[in-house]
């Protein structure tokens, strides 16, 4: 049996554990963001990397390489103004890139924070003209999603205010409800509207969608195809994110995740670099809900800004970490855990739970990759391929001069 201690994992033979693990890994896919390959940074600036992608084609090429190495990233999240600056006119080019590189367009992310008109908000702006502009961009994003066959429209807004008394919070709620209802009316039957929340930044007095309760309300108001999007970095320190996940699962409002890690706020560090146990706990709640007939149709997405780590290396590392933590959580003996919880055997329950987390699942993930014709160690394979060095040579003159965010 793999490491982790006696009684910490489901009581199966090694062959049965491998069979179970392979099934769990077969079910796991995670979307990677186009902007994660570009020269993104912080509000204080950024450090350019020669191998960073500077065009939508280079982003697709990088995404395809990550999928070739890991086998679990078949879709690329797109940011409308960064990746499709001409809107629907850019769709044919994106479709051609899908065919060329073998990865598909994933979630469509509207950009409601970049234009100068959004200084005082987008869908919540006191100006009806600006609100109409923002709503028009939402509807354009939905049409782009339809044209690309993308299911999810992932909405994050920077709307809020910095000083007490400067905005009517309730008026802004009403404007937002109206815009989301209208957006929902334009969804195709197979599309979803995912409403993301964030407690602060760039607004520091109030943020219009600040927590999961507000997102839940807005999703219900918008319509039956709306769900909540949880960004793991968009919470106050020490907040119990897995409890939020459990509530959203219970109320059938969990639509997906933007995965990243943080030490203080929305740091956009690589997943599991600071608190891997938290991600394990989140995945456990999802596995437990799935056992109860809930938890299906959850979109797993990465949302990170690789300002110091190499873009490709960080993305591959994140995908591998996500697989490992997902599998660790799958290996919890939930039947035995339920028995221990019912009897309030606190130490035994916690030790069983922690034992799965401490289990070294790398032999299982490596065996799964080999069984699927993938490199056993994707990071080593990336390094040995010379891909990053080739990209640096080909892109360096452009990437080191780029000034836009993504």
Give a label for each model feature.
Residues 7-37, 41, 45-47, 64, ...:
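Histidine-acidic metal/acid-base catalytic patches
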Residues 36-38, 80-84, 109-114, 157-161, ...:
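Active-site-proximal loop/turn and secondary-structure-junction residues that shape catalytic pockets
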């Amino acid at each position: 049996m793999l490491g982790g201690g006696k009684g910490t994992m489901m009581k199966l033979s090694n062959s049965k554990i491998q069979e179970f693990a392979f099934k769990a890994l077969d079910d796991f896919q995670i979307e990677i963001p186009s902007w994660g390959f570009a020269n993104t940074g912080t509000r204080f600036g950024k450090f350019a990397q020669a191998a960073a992608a500077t065009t939508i084609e280079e982003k697709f090429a990088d995404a395809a390489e990550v999928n070739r190495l890991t086998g679990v990233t078949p879709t690329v999240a797109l940011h409308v103004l960064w990746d499709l600056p001409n809107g629907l006119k850019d769709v044919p080019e994106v479709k051609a890139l899908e065919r060329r590189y073998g990865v598909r367009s994933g979630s469509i992310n509207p950009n409601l924070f970049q234009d100068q008109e959004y200084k005082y908000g987008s869908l919540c702006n006191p100006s009806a003209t600006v609100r109409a502009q923002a709503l028009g961009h939402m509807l354009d994003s939905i049409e782009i999603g339809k044209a690309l066959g993308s299911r999810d429209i992932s909405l994050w807004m920077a709307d809020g205010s910095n000083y007490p008394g400067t905005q009517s919070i309730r008026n802004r709620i009403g404007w937002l409800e109206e815009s989301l209802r209208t957006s929902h009316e334009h969804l195709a039957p197979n599309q979803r509207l995912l409403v993301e929340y964030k407690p602060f930044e760039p607004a520091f007095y109030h943020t219009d969608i600040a927590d999961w309760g507000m997102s839940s309300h807005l999703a219900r108001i918008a319509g039956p195809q709306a769900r909540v999007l949880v960004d793991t970095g968009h919470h106050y320190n020490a907040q119990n994110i897995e409890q939020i996940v459990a509530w959203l699962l219970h109320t059938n409002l969990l639509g997906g995740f933007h995965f990243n890690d943080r030490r203080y706020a929305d740091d956009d560090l690589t997943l599991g670099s600071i608190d891997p146990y938290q991600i394990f706990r989140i995945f456990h709640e999802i596995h437990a809900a799935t056992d109860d007939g809930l938890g299906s149709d959850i979109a797993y997405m990465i949302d990170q800004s690789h300002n110091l780590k190499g873009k490709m290396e960080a993305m591959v590392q994140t995908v591998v970490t996500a697989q490992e933590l997902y599998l660790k959580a799958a290996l919890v003996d939930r039947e035995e855990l339920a028995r221990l919880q019912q009897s309030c055997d606190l130490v035994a329950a916690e030790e069983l739970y922690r034992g799965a987390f401490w289990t070294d699942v790398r032999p299982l993930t490596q065996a799964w990759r080999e069984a699927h014709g993938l490199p056993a160690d994707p990071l080593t394979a990336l390094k040995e391929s010379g891909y990053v060095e080739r990209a640096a040579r080909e892109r360096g003159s452009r990437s080191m001069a780029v000034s836009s965010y993504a």
